[in-house]
């Protein structure tokens, strides 16, 4: 759930960044103005090209993150299975609950569970 929300926020930020890029105004053709503005336009194109490359790299990272998020087990049951795999000598794993602690519980040797 958190990864889905963070993914949506990331996509919104990328979309907002794309929409806020400056667009050069259309001006009447003038030989003096064209020469003076050619250098800044070239620089702007180079910056846009670099920005596009970084967006492509960010898109590749985002695609890799989505693939890993889909492959990773999620939910309460996967966490419980991981906890049970950590300590195989734990006798009462089927009676434990996530986030619950009983400080007054007797040890497994002293207490016999009804079958």
Swiss-Prot record:
Molecular function per GO: neuropeptide hormone activity
Give residue numbers for the modification (Sulfotyrosine).
97, 111, 113
SMART domains xrefs: GASTRIN
Per UniProt, subcellular location reads as: Secreted
> What's noted about post-translational modification?
The precursor is cleaved by proteases to produce a number of active cholecystokinins.
Q: Which residues form the signal peptide?
A: 1-20
What is the first-listed, main subcellular location in coarse terms? secreted
Q: Which residues carry this modification: Phenylalanine amide?
A: 103
Q: Which residues are glycosylated?
A: 31
Which superkingdom, per the lineage?
Eukaryota
A Gene Ontology annotation in the biological process aspect, one of them, is:
axonogenesis
Q: Which UniProt keywords apply?
A: Amidation, Cleavage on pair of basic residues, Glycoprotein, Hormone, Proteoglycan, Secreted, Signal, Sulfation
Residue span(s) of the pro-peptide = 21-44, 107-115
Q: Where is this region: Disordered?
A: 21-51
Q: Name one GO cellular component term.
A: extracellular space
The record's similarity note reads: Belongs to the gastrin/cholecystokinin family.
The role this protein plays is: This peptide hormone induces gall bladder contraction and the release of pancreatic enzymes in the gut. Its function in the brain is not clear. Binding to CCK-A receptors stimulates amylase release from the pancreas, binding to CCK-B receptors stimulates gastric acid secretion.
Subunit structure, per the record? Answer: Binds to CCK-A receptors in the pancreas and CCK-B receptors in the brain.
- Name the chain's protein: Cholecystokinin
Q: What is the source species? A: Macaca fascicularis
Q: What is the lineage of its organism?
A: Eukaryota, Metazoa, Chordata, Craniata, Vertebrata
Gene it is expressed from: CCK
């Amino acid at each position: 759930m958190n990864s889905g929300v963070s993914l949506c926020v990331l996509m919104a930020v990328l979309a907002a960044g794309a929409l806020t890029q400056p667009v050069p105004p259309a001006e009447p053709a003038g030989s003096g103005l064209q020469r003076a503005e050619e250098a800044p336009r070239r620089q702007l194109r180079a910056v846009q090209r670099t920005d596009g490359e970084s967006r492509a790299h960010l898109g590749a990272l985002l695609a890799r993150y989505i693939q890993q998020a889909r492959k990773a087990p999620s939910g309460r049951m996967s966490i419980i299975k991981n906890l049970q795999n950590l300590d195989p000598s734990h006798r009462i794993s089927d009676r434990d609950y996530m986030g619950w602690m009983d400080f007054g519980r007797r040890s497994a040797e002293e207490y016999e569970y009804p079958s």
